Every structure is written in C-alpha cells, then in structure tokens.
Amino acid sequence: MRNLAQGTKPSAPKEEQEIFLACIDALLPEIRARAGETERLGRVPDDIIAALTAAGVFRAVQPRQWGGLELDLACFYEGMIRIASACGSTGWVASVVGVHPWQMALFPEAAQREVWAEDPDARASSSYAPTGAVRRVAGGFHLSGRWHFSSGVDHCGWALLGAVVPEDEQGGAEFRTFLVPRRDFLIDHDSWRVTGLGGTGSKDVVVDGALIPDYRTHRIVDVYHGTDPGFAVNDRPYFRLPWRLVFATTIAVPAIGAACGAVEAYIAQNRQRVSAYGGPPVAKNPAVQWPLARALTEVDAARGRVRATWTDFLARLEAGQEIPYEQRVKCLYEMAYAHESCTGAVYALLGVNGGRTMRADGALQRFFRDLLAMRNHPAADLEFSATMYAQAKLGVEPPPFVSTQRVVL
C-alpha cells in the first residue's frame, strides 16, 4: 500500500481502489474484535491507527504531490463504511480525520508544504464551531479559546479550528478555518465522558494565544466563490467538489457502516437462537424477520446513494459541467436522511432481539448508541436539509450567502 501513496500517477485507478478496499478488509476482524476495548479506552488504540495509516486511510484523499492517493471519494466512503461496520468509533475517526487532507488541499501551498513536506502521514483533527476568539495581527491572526468534539485529536499533530474574524478596517466579518500545530494547543483529556462514540476521543482542545499566519487559514468566502488558494497547485476537478457536501457525507458514512454492523450482529445472534420457552427457532418468527428486511433495505439504499452521488458529481466536474444547486441540496438531505433511516432501522432491531441485547459487551447496543451520537451532529440536521431540498424543488430562491457561517452549498 505504501507504494501507492508516493505521488505517482496511477496506471490502473480501478486496481488501486480495489487494493485500498482489500487492505481495509484485512483489518476488519481485528477492529471488530477490539471495538469494546476501543470504547473503554476512550480513543482508537495506537496500533489500530498505525494499521489504518499503513493501509492508506489517512492519505486516501490527500494530493498526490504530497504522497497521497487521490482516490475517488466514492471509494473512500465505501472504505469508511466498511471500517464503521466493524467499530463505529474507529469508522468515525477514520472518516473524519481521513477527509481532512482534502480540505487542507484547499489551503495555500505554503500550509500544505508545512504539514506534509517532511511527514506525508501527518494528520489533523477538527472542531469547526466558532467557539474561539480571533483578531488580526501583523502577518496573521491571534487565536484563543476552547473547541469541543475534536475527534481523533490524540493521534493528530494538527487541528483545524473554526472562528469568525470580526469586522475591521480590512474587511467584514468572516468565518475561517485555522490550521493549528500541536505545539499550540492543549488536549483536555477529561472532556470526553459519553454514552455513544466513546472510542472516538472527541476531546476539547484549548488554544492560549497562538499566532496563526495568514497562509494557515481557509476562508469560507473562497469556498463560496470557488477561489480557494489551493487551486493554484491542486487544480484537478477532484478538488472542486463541494466541500460542504464532502463533509456531510463524511459524517453520514460512519452511520451507514454502523448500521451495517448492527445488521450483521443481529443476523449472527438470531440465526440459531431459540426461545427459552421452547418452540421453533426465532429465525422463523415474522416479528424477527420484518425489522431485518427493513434494516437491510435502508442500509443498502443509503450505501447506494453515496456511491451514485459521488460518482455522478466527479463525472460532472471532469466533463466541465457544474453540479446543479438542486443536486447539491438533494445530497445534503440524503446524507442527513441516512442518519435518520439507519438509526430508526437499528432501533427496530433492538426491540425484537431479546434480553441479551442490553449486555454491556453486546455489539448491537454499542452500534445503536454510536448511531444516536452521530444523529446529533449538525450535519445530520434533517429538518434544515429537508427545507433546503424542498424549497429548491418548489422554486424558492436559495438563502443568501452569509460570510460568518460555515454552510456553503
């Protein structure tokens, strides 16, 4: 796998993708066997992160000139679904941390060079909610504050942190993402005590007066206008995919994967299960069968939508076409709906799985708790995305761009 990540142009992209997925498949038994350990530890074990790194997970969408693979997002997302089917927490960290190189490719070249020139395996966590304080200073910005829910931060040398630059003589207020090195932030190890996604280590990070040069910032205004400075060196259509939708899908695929894992656990538990009161195997009970059929259908549909959407989006851009606004908001809604449908389907399985469901070491209940945690991410806001999608179909004008918000379609 290492040879695939050396920045050379792939001679057989399909073969490269198959190798990537095969490397992930080889890791799944170990990831699955240690899902309980991951949750108890409160973060993904170091050796699992090392194995994911060797498999190319954290270079999958990284620019080739910095040692990345630039795999199609449809392939990357399929890999993340598979990882999450073994462990929801590991899948979440792999997906979120794994997609950050794609956004970092939109930063100025100087930032990319600083991160990857000496270490192509450098990783970044994130916390985009603008909870910190920032002000302009000579050559850049002064950044301070506390950011929550920085998934996988224990394994990262950088953090992508959101803040709103206040209006001043140089311009109006605007949202930016700040790329902060590990030396400039602290991790609050007591900030992650949760009932779902416990193994993600989504801890608070604290910055006390870091100086961030301008080149280590990413402006939402550039996302809106398609003027990201990274396009100067990463000019392929691949990097012009809609960042908001890239991230929304990044959050959805661990939910799809966790639901896959829950379905697999349900099938394994009920194939041979017999009621303590006697009678035929529970597998012959329609009450056990019907929720399974629903869950299988919901998971397959969500998985198929991810594959079809991102194959279509990339094909459009490579053909020199725009992605219509209606298709963008449709994607936003479908990714939020994946959370809703997968969580609901797994909940239905819980109700007919018997008392063993609530054992603390049970995979099914762990997947469900992880799904509930994922369902509370802002990217899973079904009402917001449904409104946007329905308005587009009804001919309602889209809302105006707001430079202080992160939502750009």
Feature roles, as predicted:
Residues 1-26, 404-409:
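Basic/polar N-terminal segments that are highly enriched at the extreme N-terminus
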Residues 32, 36-39, 301-337, 347-358:
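C-terminal helix-coil-helix/basic helical segment that borders enzyme active sites and/or dimer interfaces
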Residues 44-54, 58-156, 167-172:
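Glycine-rich flavin
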Residues 146-192, 201, 354:
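DPxDG-like acidic metal-binding loop motif
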Residues 195, 202-299:
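Glycine-rich beta->alpha junctions and the first turn(s) of the following alpha-helix
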Residues 257, 293-300, 332, 336-343, ...:
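Generic structural signal for well-ordered, non-transmembrane alpha-helical segments
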Residues 344-351, 382-386:
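Short segments within alpha-helical structural elements
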Residues 355-409:
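Glycine-rich phosphate/cofactor-binding loops in nucleotide/flavin-utilizing enzymes
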